[in-house]
Amino acid sequence: MKEILFRIDDIGASTKHFNQHGKKWFYIRGKKVFYFPFANLWFFKKIWPFKKWAMYDELTLSEWKEIMSVFKAHHIVPIIAVTASWVEADSSMTPFPEKFPEEASFLKEAFLNNDIVIANHGLTHCVVGKHMPLFFGSNRAFHREFLPSLDESIHRAHILKSQEILEAFFEKPIEILVPPGNLWSEKTYRALKGTHVKKIMCSTYMADSDKPMDDIEFIPDGEGVLAFHDRELKLYGKEWLIDKMKEFNLK
């Protein structure tokens, strides 16, 4: 059986609080049965059954210990995609190790012991200043950090700063980039020049180019990669992870 790569995204990202959008269509057995046009209005996108994403909290130390016990029992070394800074409501940024010191220290020890691999999941996960929830409408489009429309200097600054924060804290080279929201650009690729990044992992290739990369490997999500968010683990616990492993005949 082919080895399965497990990857957890959105660690340390404030998108889990501020990426608020609603569910308009409801399905039964794959068929649309109900449409609610006000799902993105005010409080509706924060309540069941209209809430589609935020809000949920960061994983706690005790939750991480349970999750890692499952991975270790199955001899799996997961990829943990960390966003280097938490963007606050006022657009200020708090580095991951300062915002979540217990979680960060636990992950650092696991990384240094080769129990996990830390990947770069951006500096902010969002367009800073446009990340806050709207009274009406979805802000999901702005919870993508490496938009092709952004100036190349922004791509470069975010790559360099995120690498600086993560490598300084984890004390090892960070060699994988997981673009937030599976969106990245040729500008992002050029911004990686001179860093330790050797691989890009996500579901889609560059949004604005199909040029091959000379020095970086692209690993698409799909067969052989189980990518998910910390949201699933926060909401459904380690049992969700165990069930996923059973789907891959990992007992």
Model-based region annotation:
Residues 1-176, 183-226, 233-251:
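Catalytic alpha-helical scaffold of carbohydrate-active enzymes acting on polysaccharides/glycoconjugates
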